[in-house]
From Swiss-Prot:
InterPro entries given in the database record: Defensin_insect, Defensin_invertebrate/fungal, Scorpion_toxin-like_sf
Pfam families for this protein: Defensin_2
Misc. comment: At least 3 isoforms with masses ranging from 4032 kDa to 4114 kDa seem to exist.
GO BP term, pick one: innate immune response
Record keyword Transcription present: no
Organism taxonomic ancestry: Eukaryota, Metazoa, Ecdysozoa, Arthropoda, Hexapoda
Descriptive protein name: Defensin
Amino acid sequence: ATCDLLSGTGANHSACAAHCLLRGNRGGYCNGKAVCVCRN
């Protein structure tokens, strides 16, 4: 959801990364399908 909601602002990757960090991951990014992908 973070990738779609903020895609127009450029903040979508930051929101995705923050979401992943909160889940204990090392960050994340939005893929080509606007899905937030967390790094392990």
